[in-house]
């Protein structure tokens, strides 16, 4: 009986450790994806700078 308890605790402990490692890796990949998305958004903002009010690209004379 004691052998079964120790084996069960060992299996549960190893499962918990592997699960936490997987969650950590998942969190890191999500952070990297979010970082890439924010970099892309900032690049888009740089391309499209705000236009002052009343500005027209056409020359009116």
Curated annotation (Swiss-Prot):
Name of the featured protein: Probradykinin-1
Gene assigned in the entry: pb-H1
Maturation propeptide residues: 23-48
Main location per the UniProt record: secreted
Signal peptide: 1-22
Compartments in which it is found: Secreted
Region (Disordered): 24-61
Any single biological process term in GO: defense response
The protein's role, per its UniProt record: May produce in vitro relaxation of rat arterial smooth muscle and constriction of intestinal smooth muscle. May target bradykinin receptors (BDKRB).
Similarity comment: family membership: Belongs to the frog skin active peptide (FSAP) family. Bradykinin-related peptide subfamily.
Gene Ontology cellular component annotations, sorted alphabetically: extracellular region
Residue ranges with Acidic residues bias: 30-42
Keywords: Amphibian defense peptide, G-protein coupled receptor impairing toxin, Secreted, Signal, Sulfation, Toxin, Vasoactive, Vasodilator
Species assigned in the record: Pithecopus azureus (Orange-legged monkey tree frog)
Tissue specificity comment: Expressed by the skin glands.
GO terms, molecular function: toxin activity
């Amino acid at each position: 009986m004691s052998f079964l308890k120790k084996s069960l605790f060992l299996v549960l402990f190893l499962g918990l450790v592997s699960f936490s490692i997987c969650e950590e890796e998942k969190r890191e990949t999500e952070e990297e994806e979010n970082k890439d998305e924010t970099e892309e958004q900032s690049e888009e903002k740089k391309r499209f700078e705000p236009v002052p009010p009343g500005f027209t690209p056409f020359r009116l004379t």
